[in-house]
Amino acid sequence: MNLKFIPVVSLVLCSCQTAQTTDPSLLTFKIPDGSTLSLNKNLEIPDNKTHAALQYGELTTDRKKDDYKLNCRFDIKSFGPKTIKPEVFKIHRTVDGQEWISEEANILRFYTDVFLQSDKGTDVIKLTCQEQGDNSDRAFVVSEMETTLGDYFTFTFPATKPAE
């Protein structure tokens, strides 16, 4: 066995690793521990619903939203009608993923679940942002989520320490 190739193979494998970034417009950005999501104004949960839907920076309904464009839903435990007042929620976990809606029609659902905690007792569960596409599409980035949420919500990410 030729041992000359071990350093070369090691270098190639290490270069495949993606670095964590602090830029929410990049696909490699992950919402860091210690982040928060601020609700900036009253959010209305409709009658007989446990969520509010947002798209293009505005409240919408499940019937009116375009599943092929990025949309978000803010989920709570109890049924509306209900008004959620401005509050800062702690983000305790995020999950990014994709799943087949229809393999025959080649439709994928790209999603990010942002699990939330309230210090004020609000019965919040999570914020889910999602869009449908096909296998030639890419997942969305956090900055696109911010645009979809408009002025209703704001993410705050903790300051990161510079690399030493």
Feature roles, as predicted:
Residues 2-9:
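Sec-dependent signal peptide recognition
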Residues 77-92:
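Short coil-to-beta-strand transition motifs
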Residues 121-164:
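C-terminal partner/receptor-binding element of secreted or periplasmic proteins
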Residues 13-15:
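C-terminal motif of bacterial Sec signal peptides marking the signal peptidase cleavage site
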Residues 67-79:
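N-terminal post-signal-peptidase region of extra-cytosolic proteins
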Residues 93-103:
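Short, conserved beta-turn/loop elements at beta-strand boundaries and strand-helix junctions
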